[in-house]
């Protein structure tokens, strides 16, 4: 037993100048500043083995972080989706003491990133695979669709399940089911499409087979959709809003807090900009039920943004009502004439370049509120 280690090690001499070491339990993570000096007479191969073991220990320590131990989430039994529970905090609710749509969108983003970490991806926070990091590739949002059937209130606990799967040859998709953890009621669903961008050139890039092979092993083998209904709202094309818009909010600037780790404006910030041009009287009488956003252009930190909104003329007044709880259930429709629908358009101020187009649907607030 060497006096410099807290646990015993075994040495087996292969030749006069070759030594092999096997650890019985764990080499102490303490490293003496005079480590090399104390072992000047030991074969360099031993030092190499010890350094490699130290490196493996540090990697193991990082992979089993304190955050992962305390996080209320884990992979499902089949390993093909991820569930996590969240408590709605006081700073995440609005005037009605219910979570805002931005809060919901942030939780969706958080659980997606945690899912990637749980399968060994996203060591840099970008939900990227090893090949993507090697080639400086990142995922960016192309489309987001969120439906909220009941907003969770302050101190409620929600459980969000998420999974990803391939979406053609140019992207991937991620879906979510949001439940009230206390009742197991589905209170929201969401789906999104992501495309690959080169972080250096900021140009979109086709998803290679190498990248696809890395993440498909963690995806459902058969398509699983959070919106399995035929002709559901997530599939609806968003018409372009034509000028002049009935409502507008001009001169919006990205804040420093709006920038994410990819050095561009976080996709949740666009939701806030879209809602800036909603008439105030609508906010008093209605609450957001559905939002769909198509991301057309990357917004830079020094861009100035105009938010435009006009009512959507649409003969379809049906609203989806959830019956099941697993994301595969059928949906029923019921006529409703108190809902409001709007088209949205975000552009670079002064240039007219399209950043984002969107569609929202609003339901009448409950009388209880």
From Swiss-Prot:
Xref: CDD domains: 4HBT
InterPro entries documented for this protein: Acyl-ACP_TE_C, Acyl-ACP_thioesterase_NHD, FATA/B, HotDog_dom_sf
A molecular-function term among this protein's GO annotations: acyl carrier activity
GO cellular component terms attached to this protein's record: chloroplast
Record: active site: 262, 264, 299
Enzyme class name: hydrolase
Listed EC numbers: 3.1.2.14
Disulphide bonds in the chain: none
Signal peptide range in chain numbering: none
Pfam family, one: Acyl-ACP_TE
Subcellular location: Plastid, Chloroplast
Highest rank taxon of the organism: Eukaryota
Catalytic activity: (9Z)-octadecenoyl-[ACP] + H2O = (9Z)-octadecenoate + holo-[ACP] + H(+)
Alphabetically ordered keywords of this record: Chloroplast, Fatty acid biosynthesis, Fatty acid metabolism, Hydrolase, Lipid biosynthesis, Lipid metabolism, Plastid, Transit peptide
Main localisation: plastid
Function: Plays an essential role in chain termination during de novo fatty acid synthesis. High thioesterase activity for oleoyl-ACP versus other acyl-ACPs.
PANTHER family assigned to the protein according to its UniProt record, in alphabetical order: OLEOYL-ACYL CARRIER PROTEIN THIOESTERASE 1, CHLOROPLASTIC
UniProt record similarity statement: Belongs to the acyl-ACP thioesterase family.
Protein name, entry field: Oleoyl-acyl carrier protein thioesterase, chloroplastic
Species name: Coriandrum sativum
